[in-house]
């Protein structure tokens, strides 16, 4: 087949396609530029609007600042509240301690008051007649048995409790005896006794414990001190033989009053002879001293 030859003059090459492409490219670029320009202008307008809104609305920032200040103040408030809580805690602890101290004081006062009430109740049980009966009973018990009530408290209690107006115990009995001795001898040294009852009890107490609170022996109703035996050489001599002094004194309290009286008279005779011998010794000493003086 024969190919048809193209005439360059009649059919020139179509260059419109490249031009069209160029035009399309340029038109596309123009559109892009237009779009970009329009978008940039829109962005600028939006920024302007935002800036104008921001500039025209200072009140919107003020609340923000105020809210910030409120936030700061709120942040400070917990510190204040914490300190207040600490103070309240301190106050509460102090109040608690004060209440504990007050409660302990109240307990001590209550105990003291209850103790005083018990003492008053104990004292109110003993009447004046009971005190006189107790003291007189100690004197009579010593006269009848030759034994002190302190040495035989059980025997004395069995006898004397019948003369007390209430059901007394042995502990109350002993406490009352010690209390009467302390009362009358202590008061007598500090101040005088005005009541007739106290004066009578003091007289009985002297018969029991002596002028200075020393125990005495009652013989036939007449009181005489037993200190002469305890202070004499007899106790020491007997104790040297191997007997305890307390046993010697206790055994001596069991001796009958007639025997005690007889031994006491002999003791007085011995003491008189001792004084006579002492005077004789003094005479001999003077004579020896004079002889030595003349010799020198």
From Swiss-Prot:
Source organism of the structure: Arabidopsis thaliana (Mouse-ear cress)
Biological processes annotated in GO: positive regulation of DNA-templated transcription; regulation of DNA-templated transcription; response to cadmium ion
UniProt keyword Iron, yes or no: no
Residue spans of biased composition, Acidic residues class: 19-28
Protein name, per record: Probable transcription factor At1g44810
Annotated region (Disordered), positions in chain: 1-119
Keyword Transcription regulation: yes
Keywords annotated in UniProt: Transcription, Transcription regulation
Polar residues biased stretches: 52-72
Biased composition, class Basic and acidic residues, residue ranges: 97-119
Pfam families in alphabetical order: GeBP-like_C, GeBP-like_DBD
Lineage of the organism: Eukaryota, Viridiplantae, Streptophyta, Embryophyta, Tracheophyta
Recorded GO MF terms: transcription cis-regulatory region binding
Family per record: Belongs to the GeBP family.
């Amino acid at each position: 087949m024969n190919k048809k030859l193209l005439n360059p003059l009649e059919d020139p090459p179509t260059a419109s396609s490249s031009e069209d492409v160029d035009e399309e490219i340029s038109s596309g670029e123009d559109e892009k530029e237009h779009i970009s320009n329009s978008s940039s202008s829109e962005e600028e307008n939006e920024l302007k609007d935002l800036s104008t809104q921001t500039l025209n609305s200072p009140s919107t920032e003020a609340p923000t600042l105020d809210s910030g200040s409120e936030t700061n103040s709120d942040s400070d408030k917990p510190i204040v509240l914490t300190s207040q809580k600490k103070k309240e805690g301190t106050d509460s602890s102090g109040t608690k301690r004060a209440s504990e101290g007050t409660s302990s004081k109240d307990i001590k006062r209550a105990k003291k008051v209850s103790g005083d009430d018990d003492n008053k109740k104990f004292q109110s049980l003993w009447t004046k007649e009971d005190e006189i009966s107790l003291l007189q009973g100690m004197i009579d018990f010593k006269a009848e048995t030759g034994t002190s009530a302190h040495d035989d408290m059980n025997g004395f209690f069995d006898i004397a409790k019948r003369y007390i107006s209430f059901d007394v115990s042995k502990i109350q009995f002993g406490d009352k005896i010690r209390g009467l001795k302390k009362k009358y001898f202590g008061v007598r040294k500090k101040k005088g006794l005005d009541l007739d009852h106290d004066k009578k009890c003091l007289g009985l107490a002297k018969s029991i414990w002596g002028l200075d609170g020393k125990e005495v022996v009652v013989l036939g109703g007449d009181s005489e001190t037993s200190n002469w035996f305890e202070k004499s050489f007899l106790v020491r001599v007997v104790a040297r033989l191997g007997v305890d002094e307390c046993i010697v004194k206790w055994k001596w309290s069991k001796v009958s009053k007639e025997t005690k009286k007889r031994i006491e008279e002999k003791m007085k005779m011995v003491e008189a002879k001792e004084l006579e011998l002492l005077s004789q010794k003094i005479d001999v000493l003077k004579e020896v001293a004079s002889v030595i003086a003349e010799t020198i």
